[in-house]
Amino acid sequence: MANLKEIRDRIVSVKNTRKITEAMRLVAAAKVRRAQEQVLRSRPFADRLARVLQNIQSRMQFETADAPLLKSRDVRTITLLAVTGDRGLCGGYNTNIIKRTEQRYNELKRQGFTPDLVLIGRKAIGYFQNRSSQYKIRAFFQDLEQVPTSKDAESVTSEILAEFLSKSTDRIEVIYTKFISLVSCNPVVQTLLPLDPQGIAEEDDEMFRLTTKNSRLVVEKDAAPSNEQPKLPSDVVFEQSPDQLLNALLPLYLQNQLLRALQESAASELASRMTAMNNASDNAKELAKTLNLTYNKARQAAITQEILEVVGGSSS
């Protein structure tokens, strides 16, 4: 059995670690709320832009539009845009995206396509660069804002737009983590280019509020405030041709779609980190209890041994 000093030192170490994980959990919880609010703040613009595109759609056939971002072509090269984080300590968040990207990459190769990668986040960059003989990397981005902004989305959008318009890639898919709740986030694959803005619809958002109950953090679910925008009047007259409008608005629509993916990924990363730190804190608490029990047993055994030695010495 370990001596008392070693056990006591380990108890102190575990308690200090728990303080750190608790602090990280609280920081992640606060940032999750901010990330959710960021998504909602970008919603009115996204809704209005989608309705304008729907209005244009109702007046023309997109198949006949002279809009390169809408035109499908024979697919040979497919670019996968993988979104991970720059840091760890967030459970399986980064690992799940990397595994899904590998799965999709190999699936496309088996189907006869030529896949390549655009990577966002240090975790994906480090992983795939170490396996550069197996995976072709087209570009990468790192050190984005913790809560992604339109500037972050614009830099990535410019890169993938240039690749698509130059026909160096025929389709672009984004692999990101869809934020469902604080305890549920799923990796999803979504086609970014060519665009298909028909049937645009957004799912209802939910806000998660952190409160305290019995001295512990608990999660309460709130309905997100509605950002529904009025429909455009049917008698609106566009001064420019529909083709000109589409070519001006579709890059904005693409950027907004990418921004939404980045924001959901950021919220998912923070939620995963909060959950991981919560589990770590609980494990540290249980380990401290076990060590305290071990310490008390060892201390009791040492005292008993001393008593026996004293009794034995007096008897002799």
UniProtKB/Swiss-Prot annotation:
Protein keywords: ATP synthesis, CF(1), Hydrogen ion transport, Ion transport, Membrane, Thylakoid, Transport
GO molecular function: ATP binding; proton-transporting ATP synthase activity, rotational mechanism
Function of the molecule: Produces ATP from ADP in the presence of a proton gradient across the membrane. The gamma chain is believed to be important in regulating ATPase activity and the flow of protons through the CF(0) complex.
Assembly and binders: F-type ATPases have 2 components, CF(1) - the catalytic core - and CF(0) - the membrane proton channel. CF(1) has five subunits: alpha(3), beta(3), gamma(1), delta(1), epsilon(1). CF(0) has three main subunits: a, b and c.
Family: Belongs to the ATPase gamma chain family.
GO CC terms in record: plasma membrane-derived thylakoid membrane; proton-transporting ATP synthase complex
Organism: Prochlorococcus marinus (strain MIT 9211)
Membrane topology: Peripheral membrane protein
SUPFAM superfamilies, alphabetized: ATP synthase (F1-ATPase), gamma subunit (SSF52943)
Compartments where found: Cellular thylakoid membrane
The protein's name: ATP synthase gamma chain
Chief location: membrane
Cited Pfam families: ATP-synt
